[in-house]
Amino acid sequence: MSASSACAVVTEFFDRYRAHDIDGMTDLCSINADFSYVPFELWGKQRVLRGDGKVGTVGKAIWTGFVTSFPNLTNTVHSITGNDGGDVVVEADIAGTQQLAWGFITPTGQQFSEPHLFVFHVDDDGLIDAVTGYWDNAGISRQLAHHEVD
């Protein structure tokens, strides 16, 4: 997998994300692609849901919930860097206005815009087989006027 080919796949992924084409995003991923949104946690009464698992189960559910709660969700890609091993690093801002509850964050019509760092791996078949994302979850909560004390 050449660096330019891997970067092209990930660029298409973000284009589909911007278009809220969740099925299209998952179509760019292998059937067993790993998914890890490191800062993501939803605390419930009996368990904690974390953003770790597979794209087809955990990732797709998170992305679907996100675009539902933030109907104008968008991303601005600032840089995409890849290598011939299929590794691709993306710096992007994710932004949107909350209209529906997101986890335990009540909708107040607030907007957020937060820098994100993503690390992808694209396999030899041209499919994404790993997605990892990092961001400041507290920064998003502040922007959405959600102040939670543990």
Task: Label every PLM stretch briefly.
Residues 1-150:
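C-terminal and inter-domain tail/linker signature
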